[in-house]
Structures are given as structure tokens and as C-alpha cells.
């Protein structure tokens, strides 16, 4: 029994030793092949990487050619449309409102009848004044006849000098009374005329402030209706104080400075007008100055209190080198562009920019007309890399400059 157990233990130990020997032999046989494989793989990968950079697909980019153009310079600001005149129409006499002769929102001309106050009392007052004037005119005529008789009698000493002077004084007094009567007639006529309320200016009427049948007074602050003059209409916008010298210089040159009004999104031009005036002082809290422009507004595209973006043309730069705005990048060293040579190799070039908008940028220094610049695919570029221009080149000359939908930067130099 003991010998049998010893035999079984010997067999088990032999199996374990055999398995260990097999594992050791197998691992030793694979190790020499694996290591050279790994060692060989690294140079192969590096070599393949270099070949990929040299012989692999080229980075696709889009490009444009710098051109020369006459580029307008704009100054931009935010503004609000204001009526050229705003008038609250009030009655100048007291009475009952018996008629309104306008439709709310209607365009009216100066002198058009807007409302009617009951004229009855004013007609009566006028008739009374006219009657008193007629009475005093008759009195004056009689006094003048008496004076003429006194003057004849005085020549023969039939009346005293005192009586003659008294009659002359009566005539003078009656003449003074008549002047007062004439003034009363004019006043009564004026009151009657004022019962017809007319438009003091041309413009658009707003909503009525009082209904027919109400008793109104000259002291009413709300008035009857408000008229805003919109033909022409004004735009008040602000510019930084640093732009004042540019505007004043352009004015002194005798230029009629054109001002454009654009919508809130700066994508649609609403109207075009001219500079009217500058304010006489700078706002110390904002460092800006108010500027007023005037627009004919015959198409009613501008409305009082409307918010707009204003652009004022102050100068035009001739023969400016222009590239698309997408080509200009900003780095630690300043603005730069990627320039393409004849072999489509790219190189970074520092530039100095001038007038710019959302589409185009004037290059003041660093580029020449005819240079090709990368406009898309810039993030994949390295110095000296060869690239592939994937789309036909487009020249900036094919685009209007400045853009007709530029933002605020489109006005800055």
C-alpha cells in the first residue's frame, strides 16, 4: 500500500516537471522571434511616417489671390431714427370738439384741417366786435363833420378856440376807439380761425388723444394728436471721440458725407442719407459724440425710434491690396497669412492690416497684388508643407468691397 502511494506521487511529480519543462522550452523558443519583430517594427513605422509625409495625400486647402481695389473707408456706430419734427397738436381755444378730419396713421400736409371746435361762440364774438367797430366808425364820421364845421366857424370867430380844440380831441379819441375796435375784430377773427385746428407741419399723425364731443381746453397737455415729420427723417448715432478729427477733416474738404442706415442684423441696407451736423460736445461718460444724418425717406423704410446700424463713408483708399478676411489669422506675433508659392508650398507671412469688414481685409504691408493666400484648411498647415488647392481660385475682384452686409468692423481702419 505504501509502495503504491509512492508510485502515484512519483508519477504526479513527473507530470509537473514535464509540464514545467515544456512551458520553459516554449517560452524560450518564442522570445527570440518576438523581440526582433518589435525592434524591426519601430524603424518601419518611422520610415512609413516619413514616407506618408512625403508621398501621402496632400492637405487640401482653398486659396484666393490678393488684388488691388479702391476700398471705401466707413465709420460705424449705433443709432436711433428720430422724426425731423415732432409736434403735439393742441387747441388754442376752449370749446367742444365737434369733428376730427384725419385718420390715425394718415400722412398730412402742413395746413390740412385736423379738427373743428364748435365755432358758434367765436362767431358771436366776432359779430359783436364788428358791430362795435361799425358804431364807432359812424361816431368818428360825425365827429369829423362837426370838426370841419367848427374849423369854418372859427375863421369868422363864431366858435371859440376852446370849442375847436375840444372837437379835435373828440375826433382823435374816436380814432383811438376805432383802433381798439379793429383789434377786437382781429382777435375775434383769430379765435374763430383757431377753432379750425390745422396741421402745423407735414408728417404722419399718430393715434387720436381725444374723441369728438369732449370739451377741450388750450391747457390740455395731451393735445388732440401727435404729428411726426418723417419726410425727411433724421438719424442720430454715436462715434468714438477718436473719429472726430476724421469727420471734421472730411467736412472741411467740402465733402457731402454719405450715411447709410442698416437694419439690426447689419444684413440689409435700409436707406441712404447725408451728414447733417455734429454735436458740440463729447459725452464724458461714454467718450462718444452724437452725429445727426438726414434721409429723404420717401419710401418710409425708416420709422421714428427705430434702432439701426449707421455707416458713414469718409474716404476711399485707392489701389489697396485686398484679401479675403478668412485668410488673415492672429497669433502671438500679430496678424499673419499663409502664402502659397508656385509649387503650392505654404509659408507663414506676417502682415499689417488696414480697412476690414466681414469679407475682405486691406493689407497695408506684407503682401503684394497677385500673391496667393490660403483661405480654408489653415489648421492643417505647417511651414513649408506642400498642399493641394482643391477648388478653383477666386479673386477678391469678383467680390464687392466693402461687403453690403458687413458688421461694425467694416467701418474701421
UniProtKB/Swiss-Prot annotation:
Q: Which NCBIfam families match?
A: PRK11556.1 (NF008589), RND_mfp (TIGR01730)
Q: Which family does it belong to?
A: Belongs to the membrane fusion protein (MFP) (TC 8.A.1) family.
Listed Basic and acidic residues bias regions: 397-413
Q: Which HAMAP family does this entry report, sorted A to Z?
A: MdtA
Q: What's in the GO CC field?
A: efflux pump complex; plasma membrane
- The answer on whether this UniProt entry bears the keyword Cell membrane reads yes
Is the keyword Signal in the record? yes
List localization entries.
Answer: Cell inner membrane
UniProt keyword list: Cell inner membrane, Cell membrane, Membrane, Signal, Transport
Protein name, UniProt field: Multidrug resistance protein MdtA
- Signal sequence region: 1-20
Give the Gene Ontology MF terms in alphabetical order: efflux transmembrane transporter activity
Q: What residue ranges are annotated as transmembrane?
A: none
Positions of the UniProt region annotated as Disordered? 31-57, 391-413
Amino acid at each position: 500500500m505504501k509502495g503504491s502511494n509512492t508510485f502515484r506521487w512519483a508519477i504526479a511529480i513527473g507530470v509537473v516537471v514535464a509540464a514545467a519543462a515544456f512551458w520553459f522550452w516554449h517560452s524560450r523558443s518564442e522570445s527570440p522571434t518576438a523581440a526582433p519583430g518589435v525592434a524591426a517594427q519601430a524603424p518601419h513605422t518611422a520610415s512609413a511616417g516619413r514616407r506618408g509625409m512625403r508621398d501621402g495625400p496632400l492637405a487640401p486647402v482653398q486659396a484666393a489671390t490678393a488684388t488691388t481695389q479702391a476700398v471705401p473707408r466707413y465709420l460705424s456706430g449705433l443709432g436711433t431714427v428720430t422724426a425731423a419734427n415732432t409736434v403735439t397738436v393742441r387747441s388754442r381755444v376752449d370749446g367742444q370738439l365737434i369733428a376730427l378730419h384725419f385718420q390715425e396713421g394718415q400722412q398730412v400736409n402742413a395746413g390740412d384741417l385736423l379738427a373743428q371746435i364748435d365755432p358758434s361762440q367765436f362767431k358771436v364774438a366776432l359779430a359783436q366786435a364788428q358791430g362795435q367797430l361799425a358804431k364807432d366808425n359812424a361816431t368818428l364820421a360825425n365827429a369829423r363833420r362837426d370838426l370841419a364845421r367848427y374849423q369854418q366857424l372859427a375863421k369868422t370867430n363864431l366858435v371859440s378856440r376852446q370849442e375847436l380844440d375840444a372837437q379835435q380831441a373828440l375826433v382823435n379819441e374816436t380814432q383811438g376807439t376805432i383802433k381798439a375796435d379793429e383789434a377786437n375784430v382781429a382777435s375775434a377773427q383769430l379765435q374763430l380761425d383757431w377753432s379750425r385746428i390745422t396741421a402745423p407741419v407735414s408728417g404722419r399723425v399718430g393715434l387720436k388723444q381725444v374723441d369728438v364731443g369732449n370739451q377741450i381746453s388750450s391747457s390740455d397737455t395731451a393735445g388732440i394728436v401727435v404729428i411726426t415729420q418723417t419726410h425727411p427723417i433724421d438719424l442720430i448715432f454715436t462715434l468714438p471721440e477718436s473719429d472726430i478729427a476724421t469727420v471734421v477733416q472730411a467736412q472741411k474738404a467740402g465733402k457731402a458725407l454719405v450715411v447709410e442706415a442698416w437694419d439690426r442684423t447689419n444684413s440689409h441696407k435700409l436707406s441712404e442719407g447725408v451728414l447733417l451736423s455734429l454735436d458740440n460736445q463729447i459725452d464724458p461718460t461714454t467718450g462718444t459724440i452724437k452725429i445727426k444724418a438726414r434721409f429723404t425717406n420717401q419710401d418710409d423704410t425708416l420709422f421714428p425710434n427705430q434702432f439701426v446700424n449707421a455707416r458713414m463713408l469718409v474716404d476711399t483708399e485707392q489701389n489697396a491690396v485686398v484679401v479675403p478676411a478668412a485668410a488673415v489669422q492672429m497669433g502671438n506675433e500679430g496678424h499673419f497669412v499663409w502664402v502659397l508659392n508656385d509649387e503650392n508650398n505654404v509659408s507663414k507671412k506676417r502682415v499689417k492690416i488696414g480697412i476690414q469688414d466681414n469679407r475682405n481685409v486691406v493689407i497695408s504691408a506684407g503682401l503684394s497684388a497677385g500673391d496667393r493666400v490660403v483661405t480654408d484648411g489653415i489648421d492643417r498647415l505647417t511651414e513649408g508643407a506642400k498642399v493641394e488647392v482643391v477648388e478653383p481660385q477666386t479673386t477678391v475682384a469678383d467680390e464687392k468691397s466693402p461687403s453690403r452686409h458687413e458688421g461694425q468692423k467694416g467701418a474701421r481702419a
